[in-house]
Amino acid sequence: MDYSQEAITSLIWILQTLAITSVVFSFGIFLLVRFTQWGKQFWMFAGGYLSPKRSIKPILFFLLIVAMTLLSVRISLVNSEWYKNMYTSLQEFNEHVFWQQMGLFCVIAASSVSAALVSYYLEQRFVINWIEWLNEQLVNKWMAHRAYYKTQYLSENLDNPDQRIQQDVQSYVKTTLSLSTGVIDAVTSMISYTILLWGLAGPMIVLGVEIPHMMVFLVFGYVIFTTLIAFWLGRPLISLNFINERLNANYRYSLIRIKEYAESIAFYAGEKVEKNQLYQQFNAVIHNMWVIIFRTLKFSGFNLVVSQISVVFPLLIQVGRYFEKQIKLGDLMQTLQVFGQLHANLSFFRSTYDNFASYKATLDRLTGFCYAIEKANNKSQTQIHNHPTDVIFKNLSIQNPLGHTLIKHLNITLPQGTSLLIQGKSGAGKTTLLRTIAGLWSYAEGEINCPTHNQLFLSQKPYVPQGNLMSALAYPNNADNISHTQAVEILNKVQLGHLAEQLEKEQDWTRILSLGEQQRLAFARLILHKPAVAFLDEATASMDEGLEFSMYQLLQQELPQTTIISVGHRSTLKTLHQQQLILQDKGQWQVL
């Protein structure tokens, strides 16, 4: 090797190899996407980001990362030649060549360290950019058309969407890049080191027949055989890792629920029940972990045995030629180094099978997330149209997720400013009707006409966002749209004047305010927004009858043009509404 020309030679080698790698890698991705299920899953989240129509930058960035990977391969090839020359100088007691090799080692080491640092930065930059893009895509898909709500009512419930967006996205991107660069590094190195080993390997006599370069065939046969066994041992890890993700997410969610419903659990003294449920879920996690551990012991144990054998395997083959003085110590050491590299590259697919198992589980969770959203969005046959003033139901039929009819062929017209009270037995479909109007319920068909862009829903347990009280009052709009004076005036109207001095305080208002106060805060929000239609789902259930009467009177005074549709059980609500819709058994209904 002419070290004086090595920089130019290496540059040419990297450019040529980069061109070949780009073509082969692209064709390989095409075949995977076309003919494998996991390839199609991979492309669901990579195709949009890597598309030149969106931006050419990701592809250029990836090519730069591949170029740095090839630079590392080239440095390792130069390092192999350095091994040979350094050990040969030791065998021949050539001090001049030895120190020359030490100087060369400094150059090789500096190049290797620099390449590693630059590669790390480029890879992390690429990963972060991809995570940002993919996170935005999935969050938008989850929030669009209220899919975050609809997916809760699918027959195959979408578990832990938070983990799929936050954790699985990062795992997918990082593993995709590491596997891609790993494959490129392994294949490129394998070809390069095979050429080197071909020149180093001597002939061997097998059953009386001399076979040239026998070591090359032996190492390939050895690795292929061990890889097949490793795949057989590691295959169950794919499903086990998927189950592990689900069990851990469910356990974590149960812990969060205890914090969320701490007061209710405390009132019921339900600690024993909750603790037993936690132990059951935790035991399931531990059991699955032990199954993974025992499977990994078999898989990793086999890999470790294979790795130990590979240390002495080339030595046993080449030592005869060394003792016969057919090769020098430098050649022997280079053979060991080249064999080790070639074995590692050939074993890449075997040793990373457990990583691929986790990767496949991540792909299944992410694609399951997207399929659930598509199913939730495509299921509804309800046609919801905008109407400037009125609320009109035409042949509206609603079912529960099991297919039982709750409401059949509902036909009602509510002119602007009308108030309607919906009553019926528990489970009759009162709240479900409101969900259908809002476009949240997929198990319905028919036609709804209403002011679709000017609605507000008040639930029994109002949503109070994080932040100060001013933000909670303005939600879902920005707090900058209302003045302090206006906010104080509205709080006084809903009998929450004692909170006026705390409008700018950031606290956990859900825990500070009673449920009745939260409901009055929701009424203040309703008066502030002045919607064309207001839907009240037992929005006064935590108020006494006097407060309830005051709140509805306030709505009539402040929002005379707003159509009010309420759900409630109290008989006192009847006098506060102009019409009643009674939901009866078997989908029947009656308007009073």
UniProtKB/Swiss-Prot annotation:
Binding of ATP, residues: 424-431
Subcellular location: Cell inner membrane
Transmembrane domains' residue ranges: 12-32, 58-78, 102-122, 191-211, 214-234, 299-319
One GO cellular component, as annotated: plasma membrane
Membrane topology: Multi-pass membrane protein
Entry-linked InterPro entries: AAA+_ATPase (IPR003593), ABC1_TM_dom (IPR011527), ABC1_TM_sf (IPR036640), ABC_transporter-like_ATP-bd (IPR003439), ABC_transporter-like_CS (IPR017871), ABC_transporter_sub-D (IPR050835), P-loop_NTPase (IPR027417)
ABC transporter domain residues: 391-592
Domain ABC transmembrane type-1 positions: 58-358
Gene3D superfamilies cross-referenced by the UniProt entry: ABC transporter type 1, transmembrane domain, P-loop containing nucleotide triphosphate hydrolases
GO MF, any single term: ATP binding
Any Pfam family the entry gives: ABC_tran
Family indicated by similarity: Belongs to the ABC transporter superfamily.
Alphabetical list of PANTHER family matching this protein: ATP-BINDING CASSETTE, SUB-FAMILY D MEMBER, LYSOSOMAL COBALAMIN TRANSPORTER ABCD4
Entry protein name: Uncharacterized ABC transporter ATP-binding protein HI_0036
